[in-house]
Amino acid sequence: MVILFDRFNLPEDIFEVIFATKQQIIVAKLLIEMVKSNGGEINKTEMSLFATKLHEGNYVTTLIDEAPYKGKKVKISYNKRQFYDRILTPMKSMGLIDYDLYKKTYRISDNFNKEMIRIGLQWLREMRKPAKS
């Protein structure tokens, strides 16, 4: 996933930096909240149930902060395949969520922060290289 941002107009919400659409932002926030409410770790079955509830439009939440929905119970619908392709897989590849192959669990991770530091260090090295000509 490619993240393009304007450092002068950086949103306060990390999800707005990472995800392209409001719907993706909402679903990603709901996923993180669900994992946090389960002690920071969920199993494959719980993830599948979350994706299925979203797919069927049966996921009810009050966590949306947008103007017309704030504080109200809202049913959320999101395609299951797109959830895995556009939300979960990018979150895993960027290091926001880790999957433990042995325990078969998903957990919130700080690897994203570590990778951002590494990217910053790569830029410093590139900046300090002498010109090739």
Question: Model-flagged regions — what are they?
Answer:
Residues K103-S109:
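Minor-groove-contacting beta-hairpin "wing" of winged helix-turn-helix DNA-binding domains
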